[in-house]
Regions:
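PLP-dependent class I/II
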Residues: 3-10, 14, 18-20, 25-28, ...
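A glycine-/small-polar-enriched, mobile loop at the entrance of the PLP active site in fold-type I
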Residues: 43-46, 61-80
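Conserved N-terminal alpha-helix of the aminotransferase class I/II PLP-enzyme fold
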Residues: 70-103
Length: 405
């Protein structure tokens, strides 16, 4: 009996989706670790803390109180109200509950907005380095991602002049994160004002401000383009609880923006997932309204780790690395080590090659900057114990010393 197997004809749109390199490297490092190898995983993009106890207790109480049914697509009134209050009191932003939609993580919020706003052929400006999923999201909607380059010498920030030079009649959106994943750079008030002065001259450009790392900011006050009244009605803030509250597994994100965009996102989300988890939503209310001491503690620990890890990497020759003002990543430039040869005779032509070498020989998992739009860098997370970070720095230094010209 001969059975003929025929491949399923998958849709063309899948070609626009590139596998997340952060998830791929994390998976590879876990597989290696499962074989007994002592791998230090610095590729993962989540806090190494557990969710604060009061938030977990609130979830248990929510279940006891009957919050186990379908919630409204845009989110429970309790949470939308808590988010609006947070934005008003902490950020000075005049968003009401009707301006907010709660989604299954900030990634979901981003994709909702991009699908709601982008038509085929629209250009979306994304300052590089950028989060790995931005280009795929844009292409999935039929848009064209336009990367704006930066450098370690500029602290990985794009000037207002450079931003203006990339705007064309096809530009529909500006999408950026601050604090930035992967560089950790934070746009300050002066820099954002300069961007604002450019953007007011182009009223057809919508702005998506990804502020998921807001709570992990070592530079002082968090600043947002949404603070400028001149941009009102054409900007949306994307945020969530994953990073600042160590709630990555709860999948809680939100968009705050113009009501018509919220209504559009509600339609899209209603088609895909309906409302986000009701128990997690009630736990998130407690996160916003409860004590914030654990949030501050986590930020302080991250800052201490940043300082120690940056100092250790700075001892490695020819490895420029900015001192980030936010998030929990270092983004060193590895240009000097590209083109060198491993002891086994393999030439490391790209940052991808170098990351595989670090994992296989140094047993340190990092993510290539190629995925973030910066091919000469690698991303190293310091969401790990300080002892592990020091050990990782030693392994990286040794791996680099073993390379030959």
């Amino acid at each position: 009996l001969v059975v003929l197997l025929r491949m399923i004809a998958l849709s063309d749109r899948l070609s626009e989706i590139v596998e997340s390199q952060t998830l791929a490297m994390t998976k590879r490092s876990r597989e290696l670790k499962a074989t007994g190898v002592d791998v230090i995983n610095l590729s993962i993009g989540e806090p190494d803390f557990d969710t604060p106890e009061n938030i977990c207790n609130a979830a248990t109480q929510a279940m006891a109180n009957g919050y186990t049914h379908y919630p409204p697509v845009s989110g429970l009134p309790e949470l939308r109200g808590a988010i609006a209050k947070k934005l008003q009191q902490e950020n000075g932003l005049d968003f009401q509950a009707e301006n907010i939609i709660v989604s299954n993580g900030a990634k979901h919020s981003l994709l909702n907005a991009i699908l709601a706003l982008i038509n085929p052929g629209d250009e979306v400006l994304i300052p590089a380095p950028f989060w790995v999923s931005y280009p795929s999201m844009i292409r999935y909607a039929g848009g064209i991602p336009v990367s704006i380059p930066s450098s370690v010498e500029d602290d990985f920030k794009v000037s207002a002049e450079k931003l203006a030079s990339y705007i064309t009649p096809k530009t529909k959106m500006l999408l950026f994160s601050s604090p930035c994943n992967p560089s950790g750079s934070v746009m300050n008030e002066t820099e954002l004002k300069a961007w604002k002065d450019v953007l007011v001259k182009h009223p057809n450009i919508f702005i998506l401000s990804d502020e998921i790392y807001e709570k992990i900011n070592y530079a002082g006050k968090h600043c947002s383009l949404a603070e400028y009244p001149e941009l009102s009605g054409r900007i949306a803030v994307i945020n969530g609880l994953s990073k600042g509250y160590a709630m990555t597994g709860w999948r809680m994100g939100y968009l705050a923006g113009p009501k018509e965009l919220v209504v559009a996102c509600d339609k899209i989300q209603g088609l895909m997932t309906s409302g986000a988890n009701s128990v997690a939503q009630m736990a998130s209310v407690t996160a916003f309204e409860g004590p914030q001491d654990t949030v501050l503690h986590m930020k302080n620990v991250f800052e201490k780790r940043r300082n120690a890890f940056h100092a250790a990497l700075s001892l490695i020759p020819n490895l420029p690395c900015n001192l980030p003002d936010g998030a929990f990543y270092l983004f060193p430039d590895v240009s000097h080590y590209l083109g060198k040869t491993t002891p086994e005779g393999i030439v490391l032509n790209t940052a991808d090659d170098l990351c595989l070498y670090l994992l296989d020989k140094g047993h340190v998992s990092a993510v290539s900057g190629e995925a973030f739009g910066h091919a000469s860098c690698i991303r190293l997370s310091y969401a790990a114990a300080e002892e592990q970070l020091m050990k990782a720095a030693e392994r990286i230094a040794e791996a680099f010393r073993n390379l030959k010209d």
